[in-house]
Amino acid sequence: MDIEERINLVLKKPTEEVLTVENLRHLFEVGAPLQHYIGFEISGYIHLGTGLMAGAKIADFQKAGIKTRIFLADWHSWINDKLGGDLEVIQEVALKYFKVGMEKSIEVMGGDPKKVEFVLASEILENGDYWQTVIDISKNVTLSRVMRSITIMGRQMGESIDFAKLIYPMMQVADIFYQGVTIAHAGMDQRKAHVIAIEVAQKLKYHPIVHNGEKLKPVAVHHHLLLGLQEPPVWPITSEEQFKEIKAQMKMSKSKPYSAVFIHDSPEEIKQKLRKAFCPAREVNYNPVLDWAEHIIFREEPTEFTIHRPAKFGGDVTYTTFEELKKDFAEGKLHPLDLKNAVAEYLIELLKPIREYFERHPEPLELMRSVKITR
Ligand SMILES: Nc1ncnc2c1ncn2[C@@H]1O[C@H](COP(=O)(O)OP(=O)(O)OP(=O)(O)O)[C@@H](O)[C@H]1O
Ligand SMILES: N[C@@H](Cc1ccc(O)cc1)C(=O)O
């Protein structure tokens, strides 16, 4: 596969941003080690945003010949008060639920879970050099910048937080350097950590990634944040500014009821959540159901997506590109209920192997039911 094809795989949907494509091309050209990583807090059930969006990109990275790694951020979850802030519970959930849930998600998106390395944060934290890296980074970042970056842990600026939470962003940057990551991957909400990493890499006393004597910059790949199904806090949205702000806040999240479909949800739950979803007729700018169609169903184009309707409502219709579907919806030729039902059916089929796995192996979900999901 040539370099342009490999770059196109990295750029493929749901990628929203690559910092920068030139540096990525350079990594390929000089034959640098291609070490990817994506980190997750261990906080609750895996939803379509965390499982399928990350899983899809992991599949693409593997096809592009990049080594893939999932970083199970147990210490970070403890700092961020997840699962009652109990490190032992967090580690148990990481190894017995989260790992297998991500493996299954990667598989349904066409990747090979056996080629993904899973690393628990506490394994690398034990090494003394890790903390030296954290301090080195901290000496190159201002306090106000650290405070602005707490959004990477789902916290808001101005929120009252304990001091440990200010160490977290520096740890996330250290995780990149310490693991020799050349391709740091996450959803768009994590970009602040990666921008710090790219800048600070140039300022440290030692350089974190050296290849054949050359100091390389890490590359950041950010995927689209899948919208949650809930209604936005204000409607209609009247300005571009307001639109951007709302979109950033309205990502699918397990903490918002009816926002998320979980990877193990039953067909009935999926149908019910979609039936209640925010999906006004003709609305194509802010529409979570269309957002899911674009980033999950039409990730590959052309693809055949058939919407079944009774003859009196126009009969079956098949779309091969997202643009065709969007156009019909905008013109009122496709009813929200028909779109919702078809997206629900697609997801039920896509998630079937995961559901069946958890039916055969109920222990991970039993464990999840026994833990306290906080925040
Ligand atoms: N809706 C989403 N769409 C795509 N990626 C997501 C989404 N939500 C989270 N991610 C990504 O998954 C990774 C883990 O994020 P995080 O732990 O915040 O997810 P979460 O389970 O949705 O958390 P929370 O429900 O507390 O917001 C990050 O890279 C993040 O950008
Ligand atoms: N901040 C990430 C989790 C994370 C933690 C450490 C990392 O090195 C990377 C990612 C989130 O909230 O989803």
Swiss-Prot record:
Enumerate the InterPro entries for this protein. aa-tRNA-synth_Ic, Rossmann-like_a/b/a_fold, Tyr-tRNA-ligase, Tyr-tRNA-ligase_4, Tyr-tRNA-ligase_arc/euk-type, Tyr-tRNA_synthase
| Pfam families assigned to the protein according to its UniProt record, in alphabetical order | tRNA-synt_1b
In the record, which residues are listed under signal peptide?
none
Compartmental location: Cytoplasm
**Care to name a GO molecular-function term for this sequence?**
tyrosine-tRNA ligase activity
Residues annotated for ATP binding in this entry: 254
Q: Keywords for this entry?
A: Aminoacyl-tRNA synthetase, ATP-binding, Cytoplasm, Ligase, Nucleotide-binding, Protein biosynthesis
Q: What is its main location?
A: cytoplasm
Residues that bind L-tyrosine: 37, 168, 172, 175, 190
Q: Which reaction does it catalyse?
A: tRNA(Tyr) + L-tyrosine + ATP = L-tyrosyl-tRNA(Tyr) + AMP + diphosphate + H(+)
SUPFAM superfamilies reported in the protein's UniProt record: Nucleotidylyl transferase (SSF52374)
A Gene Ontology biological process in which this protein takes part is: tyrosyl-tRNA aminoacylation
- Please tell me which top-level EC class this enzyme sits in: ligase
* Domain of life of the native organism: Archaea
A cellular component term, taken from the record's GO annotations: cytoplasm
Motif ('KMSKS' region) on chain: 251-255
Give the enzyme's EC designation: 6.1.1.1
Oligomer and partners? Homodimer.
Note the PANTHER family from the entry: TYROSINE--TRNA LIGASE, CYTOPLASMIC (PTHR46264:SF4), TYROSINE-TRNA LIGASE (PTHR46264)
Describe its function.
Catalyzes the attachment of tyrosine to tRNA(Tyr) in a two-step reaction: tyrosine is first activated by ATP to form Tyr-AMP and then transferred to the acceptor end of tRNA(Tyr).
Q: Which family is annotated?
A: Belongs to the class-I aminoacyl-tRNA synthetase family. TyrS type 4 subfamily.
Q: What name does the UniProt record give this protein?
A: Tyrosine--tRNA ligase
Taxonomic source organism: Pyrococcus abyssi (strain GE5 / Orsay)
What would be the name of the gene that encodes this protein? tyrS
